[in-house]
């Protein structure tokens, strides 16, 4: 809840359990930079207490919130979602519009904003190839369609999940079995990994990067480790890359703007601050 240490406007992160998050570090950096009196807390809310907490968010002292696992789908149902949140099926940012508590999903802006910053012109180079068909994949696909990408190949080990997502988003999205990767890689201007493969403790992603065009961009939503084996291999081949930390930073921009009235920038200083935090072991809380 809001405390004496968070006088002024305050937002929070709602999750269960409340594991270590970099969101307070990011938002407190921006609050200091813009001279705004306020704060950003972590609130550990169990599923059975979520509805009460969200319905009385302002009573608890908050002007808005981020939502993380396992609450994103339920938060969508408890608020007034925008088109993005409805299409993705999950809300990660809550804010007040008058007395109405609205929700959106800023993963789209995080993904696209990161690509624009890390690889300008990425959207002018061929088809997009997306690996994985989970919640993160929905945000990626929505963003690619919104940007105007005409052909999105969606690869998943479970073909039924890829087909279901393709059915939702229409003819632009073409489901593909993992065995068909080799046929699509030569014409993919953008490769996006939305799976957990390559994450710390997970096996690396096995993919034939030499088949990609030399001007292709490779993006990975994983940010621990900061440079996944996929990104390291892509960089070694001279391909442009976009890492998961960049997406994390860019997705936070819109929430801060909605809550505190200033649109912050993702600066090298902020990135260095979060990179330093990533190198520190943090036990789950």
Curated annotation (Swiss-Prot):
Q: Which GO terms describe its cellular component?
A: cytosol
Kindly state which keywords UniProt assigns to this record, in alphabetical order.
Answer: Amino-acid biosynthesis, Aromatic amino acid biosynthesis, NADP, Oxidoreductase
What are the GO BP annotations of this UniProt entry? Answer: amino acid biosynthetic process; aromatic amino acid family biosynthetic process; chorismate biosynthetic process; shikimate metabolic process
Q: In which pathway does it act?
A: Metabolic intermediate biosynthesis; chorismate biosynthesis; chorismate from D-erythrose 4-phosphate and phosphoenolpyruvate: step 4/7
**Official protein name in the record:** Shikimate dehydrogenase (NADP(+))
Which positions bind shikimate? 21-23, 68, 92, 107, 223
**Any keyword NADP?**
yes
The UniProt record gives the binding positions of NADP(+) as 83, 132-136, 156-161, 221, 244
Its biological purpose:
Involved in the biosynthesis of the chorismate, which leads to the biosynthesis of aromatic amino acids. Catalyzes the reversible NADPH linked reduction of 3-dehydroshikimate (DHSA) to yield shikimate (SA).
Task: Kindly identify the residues recorded as the active site.
Answer: 72
- Quaternary arrangement and interactors, per the entry? Homodimer.
The similarity annotation says:
Belongs to the shikimate dehydrogenase family.
Name the reaction it catalyses: shikimate + NADP(+) = 3-dehydroshikimate + NADPH + H(+)
State the EC number(s).
1.1.1.25
Query: What EC class is this?
Result: oxidoreductase
Q: What domain of life is recorded for the organism? A: Bacteria
GO molecular function terms noted in the UniProt entry: NADP binding; shikimate 3-dehydrogenase (NADP+) activity
């Amino acid at each position: 809840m809001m405390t004496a240490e968070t006088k002024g406007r305050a937002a929070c992160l709602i999750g269960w359990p409340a594991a270590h998050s970099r969101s307070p570090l990011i938002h407190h950096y921006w609050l200091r930079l813009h001279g705004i009196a306020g704060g950003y807390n972590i609130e550990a809310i169990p599923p059975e207490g979520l509805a009460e907490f969200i319905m009385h968010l302002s009573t608890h002292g908050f002007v808005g919130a981020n939502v993380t696992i396992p609450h994103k789908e339920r938060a969508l149902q408890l608020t007034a979602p925008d088109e993005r949140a409805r299409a993705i099926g999950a809300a990660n940012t809550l804010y007040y519009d008058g007395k109405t508590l609205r929700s959106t999903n800023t993963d789209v802006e995080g993904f696209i904003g990161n690509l624009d910053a890390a690889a300008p012109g990425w959207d002018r180079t061929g088809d997009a190839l997306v690996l994985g068909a989970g919640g993160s994949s929905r945000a990626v696909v929505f963003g690619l369609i919104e940007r105007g990408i005409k052909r999105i190949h969606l690869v998943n080990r479970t073909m039924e999940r890829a087909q279901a997502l393709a059915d939702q988003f229409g003819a632009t999205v073409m489901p593909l079995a993992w065995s068909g990767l080799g046929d699509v890689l030569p014409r993919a201007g953008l490769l996006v990994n939305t799976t957990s493969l390559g994450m710390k403790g997970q096996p690396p992603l096995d993919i034939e990067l030499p088949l990609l065009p030399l001007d292709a961009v490779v993006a990975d939503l994983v940010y621990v480790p900061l440079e996944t084996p996929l990104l390291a291999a892509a960089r070694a081949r001279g391909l442009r890359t976009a890492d998961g930390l960049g997406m994390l930073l860019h997705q936070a921009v819109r929430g801060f703007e909605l809550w505190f009235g200033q649109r912050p920038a993702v600066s090298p200083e902020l990135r260095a601050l979060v990179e330093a935090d990533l190198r520190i072991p943090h036990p789950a809380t």
